[in-house]
């Protein structure tokens, strides 16, 4: 499903070249559950942006579902971001003036769905994450955990095959973090590929595979043992 080969990403800042990624090669198969870890500046967020087609590498190849991403047009990339990949962000990225269901339905607007269809699908997603009774609440009327559930529902609304979660529990307390990870577990069991950035070891062990980055290179790629995984 995902194959990146010798990916490099360099930024020029004044006279300095920042080597965010320096030759990363990685394959991720359909229905894998992968955690990306590394210290600040390791390149994990840069890699996540490239995997999500939000950024392009300086060199190297990225193949998604047997298609080289560099060969895709802007319209094709937009369709991939809207339909093939669901994004979950640490800061939720909800629109403050919209209700919960309207936030969940935003990807359906870009997909050209009619309002009633958007509402029906958004309500199904909100029910799936336990927030059907909060459909008409705005983000400032909800807790952090509830906002993250809305973000998860939004990520699922177009039935993407890949979920990219960037520090999905970073702003949450321990109890709420466990609840969110249980939802991600369920998403994976239903057949989605889940790729998650986290700096928390206990959260990383929900994944079946742990990839560590350091200084822009792949430091290790290991399989989590069943005894390590928190259920």
Show where each model-derived region lies.
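ABC family nucleotide-binding domain
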Residues: 1-213
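Conserved beta-strand-loop-alpha-helix hinge in the C-terminal portion
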Residues: 209, 217-231
């Amino acid at each position: 499903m995902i194959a990146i080969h010798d990916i490099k990403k360099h930024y020029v800042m004044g006279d300095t070249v920042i080597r965010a990624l320096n030759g990363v090669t990685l394959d991720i198969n359909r229905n894998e559950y992968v955690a990306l870890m590394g210290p600040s500046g390791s390149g994990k967020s840069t890699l996540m942006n490239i995997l999500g087609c939000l950024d392009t590498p300086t060199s190297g190849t990225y193949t998604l579902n047997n298609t080289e991403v560099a060969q895709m047009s802007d319209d094709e990339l937009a369709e991939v971001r809207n339909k093939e990949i669901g994004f979950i962000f640490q800061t939720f990225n909800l629109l403050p003036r919209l209700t919960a269901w309207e936030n969940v339905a935003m990807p359906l607007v870009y997909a050209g769905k009619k309002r009633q269809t958007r509402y029906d699908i958004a309500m199904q997603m909100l029910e799936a994450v336990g927030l059907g009774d909060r459909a008409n609440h705005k983000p400032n009327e909800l807790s952090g955990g509830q906002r993250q559930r809305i973000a998860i529902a939004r990520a699922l609304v177009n039935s993407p095959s890949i979920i990219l979660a960037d520090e999905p529990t970073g702003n949450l307390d321990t109890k709420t973090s466990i609840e969110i990870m249980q939802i991600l577990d369920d998403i994976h069991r239903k057949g989605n590929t889940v790729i998650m950035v986290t700096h928390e070891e206990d959260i990383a062990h929900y994944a079946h595979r742990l990839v560590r980055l350091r200084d822009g290179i792949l430091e290790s790629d290991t399989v989590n043992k069943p005894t390590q995984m928190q259920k």
